[in-house]
Amino acid sequence: ESLNHNGHPDFSKLPEELRTKIVEKVPVTETMTTQQGYLSRDLARMYPAYINSLKLRDERENTLQLNPDGTGTFRAWIARQVIRSMEKAVLDDYNMKEYPWIDFHNDRPVGFDWEAFVDFRTRMKPTPAFDKTGEPGSPENKVYGSQRIDNRHFTSFGYQHDKSGWPKVPAEIVKLYNPLYYIADPRATKAKNFRIRAGALDRDTSLAVSSILTLALRNNSIPVDYFIPWDTGHAGDYDSGDLFLWVRNITR
C-alpha cells in the first residue's frame, strides 16, 4: 500500500532560538517519518466516523457528514466559510487573483481547490499533533500531567501507540477539557453569545475544530458569530473594531 502522508508529508515550525540576547523564531522545515505517515493515514481513516457521530447540522437542519475519503457536507460547510473569508478579503482590497486555485465569477470568489488551499496553509505539526507517542511530548500531554507524572495520554490512539510508558489520564479529567460534553447538557451554564475567530493561516489546529464548536453551539440554540479572517495566523489581529461592535450589539 502506498503511503503519501495524506498528501502533506512536510511540516514547518517556528522554534525559538536564542541569538545573542534576542529571541528569534527561525522557520524549520522537516519531513514526517514513515511511522508518522502511517499514523497520519490511520487517524485520517478514523476521523469521518468521529465527525459523523457528532450529528452536526447546518443552518437548514441538514446533517453534516464526512465520507471515508474526507469529502462530504461537513467539508463543504467549512469551504463556504472560507469563501466568505475570501469575499471579505476582496472588499478589503486583497489581491485574491494571485491565487490561481480560487475560482471567480464577476470578480467574486465562488469556489476553490481544496487541496491547493491545504497546501497554501501548510502543515505545522507532525502526526500525531497533540497526543504524542513519546518524548518529549507536547504541551497538551503536560496539561494532562499530574504532580508525579509530566506527560499523560488523553486519547486511546496515543495510548495504544505509546513509546515512553506514559499512562492514560482518567476519562473524567479528559471530559473537563472538552466543551462538547457540556454544550448540550441542560445543567451546564453557557454564555448567551459566542464570537469565534480562526485565521485562514492559523496552522496550530484545523479549521474543523472551530467549525465543530460553532455548529455544536448553534445546534443548541446558542448564537455564534463565526468568521475566518483571511491572511491571518494564530493569535492574529481579528479586527478589534468589529469585536467592539459585536459587544455593543449583544449588550443593548
Regions found by a protein language model. Give the residues of each.
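Extracellular/periplasmic catalytic domains that process cell-envelope and extracellular macromolecules
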Residues: R187-K190
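Accessory cap/linker subdomain of secreted extracellular hydrolases
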Residues: S2-D185
